[in-house]
Amino acid sequence: MNKQSQIILTGAAGFIGSCMLQFLNDNGFNNIIIVDDFGIEEKRKNWENKKFTKAIERLSLFNWLNDNIETPVIIIHLGARTDTTEFDYTVHETLNVEYSKNVWNFCVEKNIPLIYASSAATYGDGAFGYDDNHELPFKLEPLNPYGKSKNEFDKWALLQTEFPKFWTGLKFFNVYGPNESHKERMASVIWHSFNQIKKDGVVKLFKSHRPDFEDGKQLRDFVYVKDLIQVIFWMTELMINNQWLIVNDGLYNLGTGKARSFEDLVKATFKGLNLESNIEYIEMPIELRDKYQYFTEANMGKLRFIGYQNEFYSLENGVEDYVKNYLASNKLY
């Protein structure tokens, strides 16, 4: 594999994208065209010291692609509007659906692979389960415009008759890890817990508003960003080496396959700081109650079936690594 080959990475200033950029650098890939809205100052530290060939503003990408002489070997499309509390669907539609269609169509035209970020938010309240088969997206009812936009693009992709050389859409579950601080309100519960502990010595969690879940026992599939980028890199290598099988194209869950409680998560955060747990339960805002997922758990059988063998971080190990090696020392990945 030629490590000088050009890779396009969208969302490169963001949380997962900047970690992906560093992981590519660590593996000898530096000819990377990074794409994002680089005007956001809080994100600058995520990307400015990493290695890349050119930084292109998100809205200029397609003009640049038309003029670009070198054909990229793959596009890793992680850029999106990810705010689950942004209820204006048109914002999500523009960035998460229409923009993604343009990326897809470019990959089709150039016959190059595409890996893009979908989301577990597509699964809604989980009434239809968490299987990453290709029938389910047409039944799903996401709880917010973000989840809806991701599901709309998944459905659109599945209905196409022309495809990129290879393609996968990855349904990220609850991702946590370094380089997420710019997300603030939308950052992981671990990030919020760490900051609450530092400030007040106590972590506030939402009470449960369902009788079948105790306070703090709401369950999520929390996945460490280091696991995510390993999977994306594994797929990238197979695709650009022509070792990916077209029969494996499609949607994939990306969690750990094991749901854990918010209480477990917060306890692990306290433990990472060598402190006793101190949790207080507060009322969930009314406007969130109908839009809240009480349980998510990725069915990971499909990714395992196609040959991915790496073990995922346990919640305790992932949180410990994040807290001790990044949050407590204020380091970036």
Regions found by a protein language model. Give the residues of each.
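Residues at the starts of beta-strands that form the adenosine-phosphate
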Residues: Q6, N30-I32, P113, F166, ...
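Conserved hydrophobic helix-helix packing surfaces used for dimerization/oligomerization
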Residues: Q6-I7, I75, L251
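N-terminal Rossmann NAD(P)H-binding glycine-rich loop of SDR-like oxidoreductase domains
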Residues: I7-N27
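SDR active-site strand-loop-helix element
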Residues: T10, V35, I75-G79, L114-A120, ...
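Glycine-rich phosphate-binding loop and adjoining beta1-alpha1-beta2 segment
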Residues: I34-L61
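NAD(P)H-binding glycine-rich loop region in Rossmannoid oxidoreductase-like domains
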Residues: N49, R58-L95
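Catalytic helix-loop patch of NAD(P)-dependent Rossmann-fold dehydrogenases
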Residues: T94, E98-N102, E109, T122-G169, ...
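C-terminal substrate-binding subdomain of Rossmann-fold SDR/epimerase-dehydratase oxidoreductases
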Residues: K199-Y333
